[in-house]
A protein has these predicted regions:
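Positively charged, polar, low-complexity stretches
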Residues: 1-92
Length: 92
């Protein structure tokens, strides 16, 4: 279980996300198991991941928190058709 993010952490992650380009896109397959695995692997490498909704734009309010839950990450923000997830890197 992840610890909730503090307000200073949220501000820090939002600022860092401004500089990121979307790394992944939610496409026609939606939140398939393969996409969820890809997001999880990307979070393992980068901690902070920006994802764009290319499809399913009408359901983004429901899908964003669902993706965060399925990947064990925090939904830092969702603005327009973009969301940002954060998960600390696993300790080696």
């Amino acid at each position: 279980m992840l610890e909730p993010l503090t307000n200073p952490q949220i501000r820090k992650f939002k600022a860092a996300a401004q500089l990121l380009e979307p790394m992944l896109k939610v496409g026609k397959a939606g939140l398939s198991e393969g996409f969820i695995r890809t997001v999880s692997a990307t979070l393992d490498q980068h901690e902070l991941v920006k994802i764009k909704f290319a499809e399913f734009k009408e359901q983004k309010k429901e899908l964003a928190p669902l993706l965060a839950e399925k990947t064990g990450s925090h939904l830092v923000m969702r603005v327009g058709n973009v969301m940002v997830l954060h998960r600390p890197k696993p300790e080696a």
